[in-house]
């Protein structure tokens, strides 16, 4: 991915746009979007919660970023979950990825 942004506000707008893709498909869960960016706000990975019971936005974005997530920033429209349900906690994936900072 080569897209980049000028501010975290712009990155968050992108995450909100991604979240909208899940509206009507993830209930009763919230629609969530996530973007992984480097220090220059270049997009390394994106994701959204696309289906009830499926991977959450954070996991999708981290998988898209792969090893580039280490040391990067995760911008997400809702705080990462930390409970066990149909999917494992997103906080575990965030910690395992080496993300340096989370912006909500």
What are these regions (language model features)?
Residues 36-104:
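Zn2+-dependent cytidine deaminase-like catalytic core
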Residues 3, 22-23, 49-53:
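A short N-terminal beta->alpha junction/helix N-cap motif
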Residues 15, 33, 81:
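Residue-level signal for inorganic ion chemistry
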Residues 5-27:
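Short, basic/aromatic recognition patches
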